[in-house]
Each structure stands twice: as structure tokens, then as C-alpha cells.
């Protein structure tokens, strides 16, 4: 018999019940016991769904109040010492303070979980870090599930991945040196789990899909030789990429089973066809929302069944944390777009797909002929749908001129033409894009969406806000203005709603971090722009002032990265389609007299593949898609882009290759350290390093901004330096926004006068 299991389940509930309960708890509107009871009910529901789908185990330990890596920091006693908390007696309030900060300490840093849109809390390791086992989190969930009558498989992230995901703090050392101390703690935790009578323990080691240094790889054998002494079977789970290059190492590990991601890396299967133990085949996509073609999946699984027999397990490719909960609640989508609805599968539907596969493997395809037929019909309809495939889009991409993604002239010539008409002072000041989104703006937008506010009244409200934003910028004496983006709910959703080929769900939420969830757009078909999206707002804003108004767009790579993307054509093709669609908007803005246009790309870096060898190909198509978004603009139109990350050094040639006339970057928190990379690289175009941190309501002093600008002037010629905040101001309040910008403009004017002498 084939075994069915799940690597992990979403935690937040079908309608984000956990999120709302957490936030009420933080506001002191909900008692701790009520939060604990709700969490228990959500876990029980998750286990029931798995059991009803004929899963041989329900997975426990995957539920968390904030983040599974934070839970592991608690379980190993590795919470940051700076908080002064005892991990053995940690209260729920203290747990949340680790994640959210308190009056004395800032929160633990967050970063992306591999190349997903989920964020984990980064462990802080010090030379003198000491570990201490506290398996309560896992043990309690095992007992709870067993009491409900379930067969249980706990999951825990493995020691090498856990260490790899952390950062060294304080005195210089290599966190790898902590492994010797950490492994006995893991042994203690696993022993506690085994003592609860579990047969299998799933240990996740996704770091194996990265380019790990040799000493880390070499450590796997010894680490797992120690952990294998635990009185339970160990399933080592890998995902997010191929581990084929480590096949010999993995076959030799003293574990009892291995999970492979056969969605992201189907080609790796051939390296493991002679694996002598349990092979868990990750055949249902845990990171996207499309139905699988179950007949095709069975074509892969049936030969494996013949080889592995009882040793074959089936599962999603990775945890289902990255997919929304239940398609059945999307009644509006089913009504408005029944065709698309038939092609989708959320978590519960994916579990049902696995159940069909299990039945087919155990009793033959005829036992589930109806379900397989339905799956095939949906796959065929999708392959041939004219809702998806538009001949004119493919034709337009195929017929792009050879140098479509190149500007007419090099930057040195363009900038002369731009400076001539822009006529800006030295160190021009601007804003990144958004201004505070007040409650009034949000209410007006919500009322309009619900049909409670007429189009005319909604537009009047937005125009009033735009005028307010323009007047404020004029009073502040900023040089290049923005319209403030009052009409935009989200920098990707706004464009997705206006581009063809996109759809939106109502409950398609996935966890980003803690209580924050995002609802990615669905890119299901060829992308086109039926009509202008931003032109009238920018044009209206420009009509209010004699100063230069900047148009604002989200770039193709960011739109791609923050969406659920169709899986029937390469991501690179989808990205280029978006770029070409955006170019129509850019040219319309240019025609309307908006000749400074910003195309934001905050997500270019996060799209980087996990393995270095794949970077060049990605950066090539991502760069091309970005350049296509402004194809055809005149030399005197100035293209800006904005990016916010802390690491540029390794991708600077690609950033320069975007050939934006001005790049604005987030640098204030790193004290301008980023700029040395741009200077060493001799970055050729204009740069606007952020001079204050917008993530804080704090108003910077004139001295702080002056210090940062003087540092910037040491590495960037004054003629090429712009002055701006780190990021958009959407989440700030108006009071601090005005005060922050006032200081920025005053300091700029002081330095301008000095430089003019």
C-alpha cells in the first residue's frame, strides 16, 4: 500500500481566524485562553482534513502562533540573550515580544524563507550561545492529535538548516562551530518525541537545495549518525530544488526515508531510483494554486510503485503553508469565472488530489476513473482555452525588434537632454511614491468597492487627496513631485486589476509572517493592458503644479514575484508579457506630458534562484523584461527605478544593466554602507540613496541626514546624487511625514549652498 502524508498545513485558518484572534489578543481584547482554544480548534480541523483524505499520518508541530523557526529557537534554547527571557518558562506574551519587539528590544530580524514569499525570524547566534532542549511545543501537539485518535508524524526543521538560516552576532566566529553543541540538544528533543510513541519523525533539511559549503555538507553524515540512534524512524525532507548532486551523500545517510520535491525538480528522480529505503515523492505543487493533471502524475508514480512498492510515499512538494486554504469558499470566482475556477486547487483540493492518487496506486486507475476523467477534462480545457491564449500577445513578443529593450542613446547623452528641460537644482529632492493612506482614503476605497459610493464621488475623494498631497509637496519645496497613490490599495493588486490575464480571489490568503497575510493575484492568461491605468491620475496631479510630476508604476518582475503565476509557459515569458503591457502605459504617460516615470522593482533580488549557477539566466530575462517596460521612450524621458534591499554587491552588473536613468535605494539603516559597492563598481547613472528610515515614525535630526548625505557625496559625484526617503510613505502618519521631509529639504538646501560656493 502507498502511504500518503502532508509536509505541513497552513496555520491561519480558512478565513484568517488566527490572524484576527492574534491581533485582538495584542490589543488586549481577547483573553489568552480564548486564543489558545481557537488555535486548538484550527489544529483539530487541519488534522481532520488530513485524516478524512485518507492520510496515513497527520502532521503535527507545523502549527505555530508566529513562525516555525521562532518555535525552534525556543525549543533549542536559542532565543536572543538580549531579551533576558528564559526559553524554558517563556510566556505567550514573551514569545510575541521576540517576534514584535518591546520597549527595550527591537524585534528579531525577518527574512524570506528560501525563495518563497513567507518570512521567518532569523536566529541570532553568538560565540557563547548555549542550547537547552524544550520540546514542549512538539510534545503537546503530538498528545493533542493522539487524544483525537490520529496516527501522528511530527515535523521539525533539521539542525544544519536551522544553523544555516541564522546569523552570527557579536564577537566574530563561525556559527558552524555551534553544531557540536546543537546536535545533542536535537537528540534530546527527538528522544522526547519518540517517547510519545510516534513511529516516524519528519526532519526538514531544505538547505540541501542550496549551494552549501563543503564542510556543511560533510557534516550531514556525522549529524544524522547521531540522530539515527533515536527510537523512531526518520524521514529527511528536502524541497524547493534539486538535491541530485548530493545523491551519494543522501543514499548513505542513516535515515529511514527521503522526501524529494518532484515539482520544482522532476529531473532529480533519476538519481534516486535505486534508493533502498522509503521514497516520499512530492508530486503535488505546494507553492502554486493549479490543479494537477493526475493522469500525468500517475505516469510518473506507477513505475515508482512497481520499484518501491510499500516504500513509496506520496506528498505535496513542500509544506502547503504557501497555498490558500480552501477553493470552495470562492463562490464569487466560481460565479464570475467558472472556467478559471475549474483549473484551481487550494490546500484542501490538493489533499483531495493526493487521495485520488493514493487510491489509483493501490486499486488501479479504474477505481478513480471519474476523478481522473474530471482532472483530464480540466487540463485539456486549460490547454486549449482562448481565455488564456491570445495569438496577438505571442505575435507581439515574437516580433519585437532586435534592440527593443535598448534606449536610443547611452546615459551620458540622455542625461544632458533630460537635465536641459528638467532644470533641477543640485541634489534634487523627491519622494519614492506613496504618501500616508489615511483612514478616510481606505474607507472611500472600501465603500466604492462595495457599491456604497458612486464613481463620481470616489473620484472626487481621490482628486481631493491628490491635490492635498501636491500642495503639501509644494509647501515643502520638493523638486520632483508624486501624486501620492491614494487610489492604490496595493502596488501589485492595483495593476493586476487593470491588466487582462489576471484574476483575484476573495479568500486566497497566504501567510507572509506572523499575523500578516497576503492575497496574491492569479496570473492565468496572456497579459495585455486594455486601457490606460494611471495616466489620468498623474495628468490631473501635473495640472495642479508647474513642478515636475513623476509617474509611478510597479515593474514586471515584482508583479510576477508577488503573484500566483501560470505554470503552462515559462515564468520568463510571463514576465516579458507584463513588461510589454507596461510599455504601453509608459508611452501613454510620456504622451500625456509625464516625462519622469518610476518603475519600481523591489522584488528583483528575491527572484534569484537558490543556486548560483542559475542566476545569470534569471538576471538576463528579468533585466530584459524591465527594459521592455520602457521600450520606445524618448531620450529626454527620465526613467527611475526603486529597490529596497540590503545586498547589492553580487548583482550590481545586472542592476546597472537595467539602464534606469535614476535608481533610488534603501540605505539609511545601513549608514550608507551600500553605496561603497556602487562606488567600487563605478555605477554609471544617477543615484538617490535613502536618507532616512520610513519604517519608523521617528523624525531624524538634521545632523543625521547631513551625516548620511556627506557620506554619499564622498562616493557619488554631486551632479549624480538625488535626495529622498528610503521608501514610500504609505504606512506613516501625516504629522511625522511633514516633519521628516522638512528636515530632509532643509539639510539639502544647506549642502546645496555649500557646494555652490
UniProtKB/Swiss-Prot annotation:
The active site is at residue 695. Binds 1 zinc ion per subunit. This is 5-methyltetrahydropteroyltriglutamate--homocysteine methyltransferase. 5-methyltetrahydropteroyltri-L-glutamate binds at residues 16-19, 112, 516-517, 562, 606. It is an enzyme of class 2 (transferase). Keywords: Amino-acid biosynthesis, Metal-binding, Methionine biosynthesis, Methyltransferase, Repeat, Transferase, Zinc. Its EC number is 2.1.1.14. It catalyses: 5-methyltetrahydropteroyltri-L-glutamate + L-homocysteine = tetrahydropteroyltri-L-glutamate + L-methionine. L-methionine binds at residues 432-434, 485, 600. The keyword Repeat applies. Pathway: Amino-acid biosynthesis; L-methionine biosynthesis via de novo pathway; L-methionine from L-homocysteine (MetE route): step 1/1. One of its GO terms (biological process) is methionine biosynthetic process. Its cofactor is Zn(2+). Catalyzes the transfer of a methyl group from 5-methyltetrahydrofolate to homocysteine resulting in methionine formation. Belongs to the vitamin-B12 independent methionine synthase family. InterPro entries: Cbl-indep_Met_Synth_N (IPR013215), Cobalamin-indep_Met_synthase (IPR006276), Met_Synth_C/arc (IPR002629), UROD/MetE-like_sf (IPR038071). L-homocysteine binds at residues 432-434, 485, 600. One of its GO terms (molecular function) is zinc ion binding. It comes from Actinobacillus pleuropneumoniae serotype 7 (strain AP76). Zn(2+) binds at residues 642, 644, 666, 727.
Amino acid at each position: 500500500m502507498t502511504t500518503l502524508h502532508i509536509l505541513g498545513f497552513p496555520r491561519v485558518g480558512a478565513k484568517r481566524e488566527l490572524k484576527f484572534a492574534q491581533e485582538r489578543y495584542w490589543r488586549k481584547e481577547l483573553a489568552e485562553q480564548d486564543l489558545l482554544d481557537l488555535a486548538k480548534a484550527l489544529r483539530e480541523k487541519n488534522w481532520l482534513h488530513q485524516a478524512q483524505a485518507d492520510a496515513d499520518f497527520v502532521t503535527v508541530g507545523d502549527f505555530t502562533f508566529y513562525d516555525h523557526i521562532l518555535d525552534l529557537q525556543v525549543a533549542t534554547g536559542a532565543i536572543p540573550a538580549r531579551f533576558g527571557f528564559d526559553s524554558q518558562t517563556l510566556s505567550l506574551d514573551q514569545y510575541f515580544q521576540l517576534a514584535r519587539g518591546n520597549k527595550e528590544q527591537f524585534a528579531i530580524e525577518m527574512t524570506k524563507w528560501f525563495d518563497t514569499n513567507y518570512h521567518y525570524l532569523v536566529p541570532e547566534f553568538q560565540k557563547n550561545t548555549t542550547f537547552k532542549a524544550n520540546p514542549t511545543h512538539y510534545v503537546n501537539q503530538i498528545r493533542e492529535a493522539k487524544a483525537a485518535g490520529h496516527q501522528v508524524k511530527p515535523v521539525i526543521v533539521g539542525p544544519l538548516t536551522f544553523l544555516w538560516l541564522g546569523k552570527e552576532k557579536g564577537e566574530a566566529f563561525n556559527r558552524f562551530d555551534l553544531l557540536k553543541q546543537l546536535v545533542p540538544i536535537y537528540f534530546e528533543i527527538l528522544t522526547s518525541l519518540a517517547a510519545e510513541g510516534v513511529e516516524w519523525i519528519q526532519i526538514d533539511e531544505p538547505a540541501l537545495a542550496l549551494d552549501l559549503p563543503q564542510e556543511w555538507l560533510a557534516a550531514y553524515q556525522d549529524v544524522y549518525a547521531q540522530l539515527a540512534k533515536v527510537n523512531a524512524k526518520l524521514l529527511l525532507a528536502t524541497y524547493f530544488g534539486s538535491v541530485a548532486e548530493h545523491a551519494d551523500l543522501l543514499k548513505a545517510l542513516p535515515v529511514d526515508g527521503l522526501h524529494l520535491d518532484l515539482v520544482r525538480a522532476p529531473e532529480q528522480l533519476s538519481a534516486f531510483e535505486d534508493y533502498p529505503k522509503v521514497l516520499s515523492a512530492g508530486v503535488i505543487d505546494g507553492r502554486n494554486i493549479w490543479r494537477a493533471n493526475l493522469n500525468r502524475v500517475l505516469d510518473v508514480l506507477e513505475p515508482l510503485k512497481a520499484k518501491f512498492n510499500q516504500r513509496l510515499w506520496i506528498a505535496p512538494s513542500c509544506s502547503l503553508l504557501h497555498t490558500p486554504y480552501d477553493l470552495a469558499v470562492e463562490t464569487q470566482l466560481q460565479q464570475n469565472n467558472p472556467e478559471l475556477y475549474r483549473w484551481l486547487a487550494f490546500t484542501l483540493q490538493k489533499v483531495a488530489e493526493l487521495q485520488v492518487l493514493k487510491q489509483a496506486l493501490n486499486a488501479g486507475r479504474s477505481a478513480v476513473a471519474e476523478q481522473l476523467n474530471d482532472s483530464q477534462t480540466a487540463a485539456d480545457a486549460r490547454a486549449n482555452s482562448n481565455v488564456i491564449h491570445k495569438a496577438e500577445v505571442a505575435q507581439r513578443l515574437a516580433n519585437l525588434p532586435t534592440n527593443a529593450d535598448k534606449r536610443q542613446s547611452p546615459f551620458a547623452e540622455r542625461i544632458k537632454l533630460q537635465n536641459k528641460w528638467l532644470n533641477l537644482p543640485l541634489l534634487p529632492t523627491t519622494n519614492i511614491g506613496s504618501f500616508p493612506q489615511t483612514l478616510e482614503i481606505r474607507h472611500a476605497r472600501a465603500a466604492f468597492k462595495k457599491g456604497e459610493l458612486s464613481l463620481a464621488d470616489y473620484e472626487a475623494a481621490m482628486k481631493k487627496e491628490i491635490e492635498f498631497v501636491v500642495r503639501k509637496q509644494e509647501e515643502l519645496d520638493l523638486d520632483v513631485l508624486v501624486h501620492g497613490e491614494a487610489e492604490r490599495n496595493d502596488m501589485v493588486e492595483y495593476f493586476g486589476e487593470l491588466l487582462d490575464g489576471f484574476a483575484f480571489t476573495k479568500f486566497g490568503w497566504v501567510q507572509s509572517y506572523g499575523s500578516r497575510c497576503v492575497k496574491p493575484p492569479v496570473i492565468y492568461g496572456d497579459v495585455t493592458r486594455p486601457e490606460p491605468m494611471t495616466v489620468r491620475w498623474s495628468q490631473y496631479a501635473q495640472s495642479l503644479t508647474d513642478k515636475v510630476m513623476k509617474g509611478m508604476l510597479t515593474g514586471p518582475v515584482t508583479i510576477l514575484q508577488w503573484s500566483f503565476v501560470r505554470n503552462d509557459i515559462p515564468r520568463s515569458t510571463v514576465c516579458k508579457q507584463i513588461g510589454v503591457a507596461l510599455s504601453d502605459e509608459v508611452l501613454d504617460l510620456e504622451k500625456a506630458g509625464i516625462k519622469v516615470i518610476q518603475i519600481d522593482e523591489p522584488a528583483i533580488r528575491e527572484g534569484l534562484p537558490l543556486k548560483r549557477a542559475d542566476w545569470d539566466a534569471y538576471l538576463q530575462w528579468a533585466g530584459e523584461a524591465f527594459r521592455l517596460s520602457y521600450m520606445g521612450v524618448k531620450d529626454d524621458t527620465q526613467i527611475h527605478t526603486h529597490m529596497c534591499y540590503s545586498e547589492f554587491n553580487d548583482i550590481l552588473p545586472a542592476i546597472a544593466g537595467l539602464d534606469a536613468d535614476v535608481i533610488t535605494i534603501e540605505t539609511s539603516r545601513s549608514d550608507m554602507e551600500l553605496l561603497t559597492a556602487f562606488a567600487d563598481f563605478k555605477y554609471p547613472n544617477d543615484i538617490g540613496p535613502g536618507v532616512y528610515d520610513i519604517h519608523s515614525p521617528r523624525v531624524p535630526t538634521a545632523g543625521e541626514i547631513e551625516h548620511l548625505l556627506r557620506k554619499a557625496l564622498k562616493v557619488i559625484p554631486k551632479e549624480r546624487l538625488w535626495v529622498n526617503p528610503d521608501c514610500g510613505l504609505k504606512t506613516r502618519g501625516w504629522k511625522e511625514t511633514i516633519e521628516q521631509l522638512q528636515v530632509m529639504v532643509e539639510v539639502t538646501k544647506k549642502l546645496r549652498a555649500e557646494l555652490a560656493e
